[in-house]
Curated annotation (Swiss-Prot):
Pathway(s): Aromatic compound metabolism; 3-phenylpropanoate degradation
Family matches, as NCBIfam families: PRK11342.1
Gene that produces this protein: mhpD2
Enzyme Commission number(s): 4.2.1.80
GO CC field: cytoplasm
Annotated organism of origin: Dechloromonas aromatica (strain RCB)
Annotated protein name in UniProt: 2-keto-4-pentenoate hydratase 2
Length: 262
């Protein structure tokens, strides 16, 4: 390794510091000795272990890059995942304090709450449906520790899949009572509709994304467990956030959820 490149531990330290002090860093993809998927997840895992050792509580996972268009843009053929910690949760309608995030954007998603562990090497629809306690409407508030969102696959994976915060709606719905493939989504900023979509935008169905995640988590040695929250991926385009804005999301059959920014 030459002095021009850094080890995963050094990259993880840069991202961890950026998370703590709110100052973004330059992209990592040209600074890692080996800039591939395995290296990116190694960086993420280093910080996951560090945060767990510091007492942060792991409560679930998020799935990113579920749009085929975004995958093509980043030159990949699969989604990615990141960790959800308890201190990332924001109440429905709760104000997100200014300065808590660096360059936030919002996405409307279906959240699944698991009632059983998912530990099979390869899961089926039946496995997932049986394991899911209920679904909730959600807003993922994504963020990037990389300057100006100048990201490629390696950057976002290393940066915990560009995780920030998340908001869950308060109305739980059983999977038998909703069509997650056809459900329509509308997001408003104030009175203006800024994003529309449906379940098909998320790998054809949020359930497809969740099955992908369940299989990957078993291979990674961190299988999904009862009680975990799974943010299954965006149902429509993400929207940048400015101070003072309010976002209201409605997902057909699931209900509403809101995020407010100071």
């Amino acid at each position: 390794m030459t002095n021009n490149f850094m080890a995963p531990e050094a990259a993880a330290a840069l991202l961890k510091a950026a998370t703590a002090d709110g100052r973004p860093i330059a992209p990592l993809r040209d600074r890692l000795a080996i800039a591939d998927q395995d290296s990116a997840y190694a960086v993420q895992e280093i910080n996951t272990r560090a945060w767990l050792a510091e007492g942060r509580r792991l409560v679930g996972r998020k799935i990113g890059l579920t749009s085929l268009a975004v995958q093509a843009q980043l030159g990949v053929d699969q989604p990615d995942f990141g960790m959800l910690f308890a201190d990332m949760a924001v109440g429905d309608g709760e104000i997100v304090a200014a300065g808590r995030l660096i360059q936030p954007k919002v996405e409307a998603e279906v959240a699944l709450i698991l009632g059983r562990d998912l530990t099979q090497e390869r899961h089926t629809y039946a496995d997932l449906i049986r394991a899911t306690e209920y679904a909730l409407p959600s807003i993922e508030i994504v963020d990037s520790r990389i300057e100006n969102w100048n990201i490629k696959f390696v950057d976002t994976v290393a940066d915990n899949a560009s995780s920030g915060l998340f908001v869950l709606g308060g109305r739980s719905v059983r999977l038998c009572d909703i069509d997650l493939t056809a459900c329509a989504m509308e997001m408003k900023r104030g009175d203006e509709v800024v994003s529309r979509g449906n379940g098909r935008a998320c790998l054809g169905s949020p359930l497809n994304a969740a099955i992908w995640l369940a299989d990957v988590m078993v291979r990674c040695g961190r299988p999904l467990q009862a009680g975990d929250i799974v943010l299954t991926g965006a149902l429509g385009p993400m929207v940048a956030v400015k101070s003072g804005e309010r976002f209201d999301v409605s997902i057909e059959g699931l209900g509403n959820v809101s995020a407010l920014f100071a």
